[in-house]
């Protein structure tokens, strides 16, 4: 072993182990009705989402999307995963969402749709992951501290 002076010498003696770069082949996950199920979370909202092939109808808590999320911005948030994956109007979505406000609920449904899409069609995973839709947005409201008016705001200071 004393004849090994550099890293190249060591590699020639030991031999380089072949590095196996195997992409994991993911199988589509569907239930007996041909649907994919996923949960999405955002702030305090939790959404349970089922998707199946269809005409693009989105139902949230038993109501059409445009009735439950009246603001166009929230409707746009729900459509983002379909635009990124280039599958607009190909899936029906049935979601139940609870907790939080409307913005958090829209984010939770979007997260759930993204996760369900990649379970239904694993080939869409790369596009959804690149857009950041499969990552749980961990930002939540900061807690209020004692001795402060809010989380960070101090009480008014009076010099005299």
Curated annotation (Swiss-Prot):
Which Gene3D superfamilies does the record cross-reference, listed alphabetically?
3.30.230.10
Family classification: Belongs to the universal ribosomal protein uS9 family.
Keywords per UniProt: Ribonucleoprotein, Ribosomal protein
Against InterPro entries, the record matches this protein to: Ribosomal_Su5_D2-typ_SF, Ribosomal_uS9, Ribosomal_uS9_bac/plastid, Ribosomal_uS9_CS, Ribsml_uS5_D2-typ_fold_subgr
Q: What is this protein called?
A: Small ribosomal subunit protein uS9
Listed under GO cellular component are: cytosolic small ribosomal subunit
Task: Please give the superkingdom of this protein's source.
Answer: Bacteria
Detail the disulphide connectivity of this chain as listed in its UniProt entry: none
Name one process (GO BP) from the record: translation
Q: Which GO terms describe its molecular function?
A: RNA binding; structural constituent of ribosome
Q: Which PANTHER family match?
A: RIBOSOMAL PROTEIN S9, SMALL RIBOSOMAL SUBUNIT PROTEIN US9M
* One Pfam family in the UniProt entry: Ribosomal_S9
């Amino acid at each position: 072993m004393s004849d090994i002076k550099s890293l190249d010498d060591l590699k020639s003696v030991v031999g380089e182990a072949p590095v196996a770069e195997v992409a994991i082949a993911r199988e589509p996950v569907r239930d007996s009705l041909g649907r994919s199920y996923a949960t999405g979370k955002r702030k305090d909202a939790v959404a349970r989402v089922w998707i199946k092939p269809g005409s693009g109808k989105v139902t949230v808590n038993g109501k059409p999307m445009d009735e439950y999320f009246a603001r166009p911005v929230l409707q746009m948030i729900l459509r983002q995963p379909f635009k990124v994956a280039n599958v607009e109007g190909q899936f029906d979505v049935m979601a139940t969402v609870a907790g939080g406000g409307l913005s958090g609920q829209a984010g939770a449904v979007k997260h759930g749709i993204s996760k369900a899409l990649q379970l239904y069609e694993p080939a869409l995973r790369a596009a959804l992951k690149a857009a950041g839709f499969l990552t749980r947005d961990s930002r939540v409201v900061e807690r209020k501290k004692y001795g402060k008016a809010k989380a960070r705001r101090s009480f008014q200071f009076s010099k005299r």
